[in-house]
């Protein structure tokens, strides 16, 4: 799948209440999680690929996982 599919549906990206606290904890951020992740998707330096049922976005030391059907941010964490 082409990453343009994710970019065309960026307005659908969201997460659940528990996802917000988990992602904030994993990344050590206090800002809006959804906007943070959308900005990483839009960043030209991000590596975006689809594997199975998920999209993966890698940017610097961060990896974000988004469900390809529902566009729910599943998790985000630092890459070690």
Explain the meaning of each model-derived region.
Residues 1-80:
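Ribonuclease/tRNase effector modules and their secretory precursors
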């Amino acid at each position: 799948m082409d990453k343009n599919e994710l970019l065309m549906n960026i307005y659908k990206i969201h997460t659940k209440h528990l996802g917000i606290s988990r992602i904030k904890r994993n990344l050590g951020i206090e800002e809006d999680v959804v906007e943070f992740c959308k900005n990483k998707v839009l960043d030209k330096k991000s590596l975006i690929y689809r594997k199975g049922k998920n999209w993966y976005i890698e940017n610097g030391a961060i990896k974000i996982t988004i469900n390809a059907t529902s566009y729910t941010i599943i998790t985000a964490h630092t890459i070690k």
